[in-house]
From Swiss-Prot:
Catalysed reaction equations from the record: [HPr protein]-L-serine + ATP = [HPr protein]-O-phospho-L-serine + ADP + H(+); [HPr protein]-O-phospho-L-serine + phosphate + H(+) = [HPr protein]-L-serine + diphosphate
Residues reported in the UniProt entry to bind ATP: G161, D162, S163, G164, L165, G166, K167, S168
Highest rank taxon of the organism: Bacteria
Coiled-coil parts of chain: none
Keyword Amino-acid biosynthesis on entry: no
Free-text note on domains in this protein's UniProt record: The Walker A ATP-binding motif also binds Pi and PPi.
Sequence segments annotated as region (Important for the catalytic mechanism of both phosphorylation and dephosphorylation): 209-218
Protein name (database record): HPr kinase/phosphorylase
Keywords from the named record: ATP-binding, Kinase, Magnesium, Metal-binding, Multifunctional enzyme, Nucleotide-binding, Serine/threonine-protein kinase, Transferase
Gene Ontology molecular function: any one: protein serine/threonine kinase activity
Gene for this chain: hprK
EC number: 2.7.11.-, 2.7.4.-
Its job: Catalyzes the ATP- as well as the pyrophosphate-dependent phosphorylation of a specific serine residue in HPr, a phosphocarrier protein of the phosphoenolpyruvate-dependent sugar phosphotransferase system (PTS). HprK/P also catalyzes the pyrophosphate-producing, inorganic phosphate-dependent dephosphorylation (phosphorolysis) of seryl-phosphorylated HPr (P-Ser-HPr).
């Protein structure tokens, strides 16, 4: 990941209003940031932002009331030594939180070394939590995938397939049935947590759907505010294919998944053929996926019935699967 654009200036601009930050000194060091190695070796954003800790170099150091109080109780010699060690770590910037006054020696050393020094009336814990969330978002793994991303029955579904299979037309049909559009053609995905991937629409394509023969359609204007979504978690990928019947597996015995940013995402394959109601099939696939997430697997239940029937031909089964 390119970390060159992540520096003291960009972090300050993005968080100054929310965290009530003031830039006290060290303006010349606005380009300070994280090295690629530091980001690569970080297991989480907690490695990049935290309370004052002289063991962790290249880290955003936050000094709260407890740290300032401890500093005030030190001898002049210890104060000077601690401040020298802190500046020698070359942090991207320092934050004095909790409305505490920045120690004069710290201000002087930051000025001389061009180390950005911020102050805020907010508590150190609140600043750390907010900056960790911010860092986790901007450093999260990202990818752009081709397809139509929709909200179907509250589930994020990506329609994929070769060009000309009718993905956009299918998306338009699903939107007309009350579902919502997130993005068409290019979908930006980011892994924001250990167990979910979130998809958004690039600003340039917001609310737009391209349909052959009709051109660009503004879905929000045509269908209303409820027909579009800002973002959704990706839960299912529906791949549209056109192939001879002999190559198509009617009952896949194993669940299919696709790796997206290191996370396995459920996948179903739907064959495109004349006369097939693809919108109904996609809705059924989504409903079936919802059942699977709840622990209900229709195919597995059928296979269990089949095995029991082979073992005991006289056994009776209920009229429904669940």
């Amino acid at each position: 990941m390119d970390t060159s654009s992540i520096n003291a200036q960009s972090i300050f601009d993005d968080n100054a209003a929310m965290l009530k930050l003031s830039w006290l000194t060290g303006h010349e060091g606005w380009e300070r940031g994280f090295s690629a190695d530091t980001v690569a070796n970080a297991t989480s954003s907690a490695d990049l932002v935290g309370h004052l800790n002289l063991i962790h170099p290249n880290r955003i150091q936050v000094l709260g009331e407890a740290e300032i109080d401890y500093y005030q109780r030190q001898t002049d010699e210890d104060r000077s030594r601690h401040m020298a060690e802190l500046i020698a770590l070359e942090p991207p910037f320092l934050v004095v939180a909790g409305g505490a006054a920045a120690p004069p020696e710290l201000v002087l050393r930051c000025t001389r070394s061009s180390t950005p020094l911020f102050t805020t009336p907010m508590s150190a814990a609140a600043v750390i939590d907010s900056l960790r969330l911010y860092m986790s978002r901007i450093l999260a793994p990202r990818a752009t995938l081709h397809g139509v991303f929709l909200d179907i029955l509250g589930m994020g579904v990506l329609l994929t397939g070769d060009s000309g299979l009718g993905k956009s037309e299918l998306g338009l049909e699903l939107i007309s049935r009350g579902h919502g559009l997130v993005a068409d053609d290019a979908v930006d995905f980011v892994r924001l947590g250990p167990d979910f991937v979130e998809g958004r629409c690039p600003p340039l394509l917001q609310n737009l759907l391209e349909v052959r023969g009709l051109g660009l359609l503004d879905i929000k204007t045509i269908f209303g505010e409820t027909a579009v979504r800002r973002k959704m978690k990706l839960k299912l990928i529906v791949q549209l294919v056109r192939r001879p019947d002999g190559e198509f597996q009617r009952l896949p015995l194993e669940s299919q998944t696709v790796d997206v940013l290191g996370l396995p995402i459920s996948k179903v394959t739907i064959q495109v053929a004349a006369g097939r109601n693809l919108a109904v099939l996609v809705e059924a696939a989504v409903r079936n996926t919802i059942l699977q997430l709840r622990g209900i697997d229709t195919l597995r239940d059928f296979m269990d019935r089949q095995r029991l029937a082979m073992q005991d031909p006289d056994s009776q089964f209920p009229g429904k699967l669940v």
